[in-house]
Amino acid sequence: MLELRSVTAGYDRRAPVVRGMGLTIEAGGSVGLLGPSGCGKSTLARVAALLHRPYAGEVVLDGVPVAGWRHHAPRAQRTAIGVVFQQPRLSADPRLRIADIIAEPLRATGRGADARSRTEELAQAVGLGGDLLGRRPHEVSDGQLQRACVARALVLRPRLLICDEMTAMLDASTTAALVGVVEEYRARSGAALLAVGHDRVLLERWCERTVAWPDLTAPSPR
């Protein structure tokens, strides 16, 4: 499903935060990436999500090497991945209503005709009442906004979900609810999961396999 091969990445070529990392996620599998804050795991997650071009190495999705990043990535690869970040207020457009945040990927890919029905379906799945869909981010809580961001990540029915510290800002009940939403989707769709975090207990309960950050320096299995 996803292979990261000897990836080196960062924000300064002279001091990359990710050096020669490898990771494999099988189709339908779930991997937890465990590491302390600042180690580079979120940068690696952005590479895996095709949002950050590495300096070196290769990303292979469904057996096809990735040749472009961000909006330059082929649509078939770009839309195969759904991403949820740690801070919803940094990843949601504050000008949009909650319903439009959820539907944003549909409209961006020319599928706006499905927006209303799909938004209502996913809002119910993540526990957002209909009265919240007309509000803007500043009118809802962090937990409610993160629910919307999870719905947005699922709206194109991705084959791979990347959850980068998705629950770090949430209370225990919201964490359990959103992990449940992700796992219900995976059970229905067969999607794979990369969950990134620093909470070993959560990752080991959530994922089939948990990999600690230093262990990624070893070559990824082929």
Residue ranges and their predicted role:
Residues 114-131:
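Conserved ABC ATPase "signature" region
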Residues 57-68:
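Conserved ABC transporter NBD signature motif
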Residues 66-82, 96, 100, 108:
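ABC ATPase NBD coupling module
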Residues 150:
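Hydrophobic anchor residue at the start of the ABC signature
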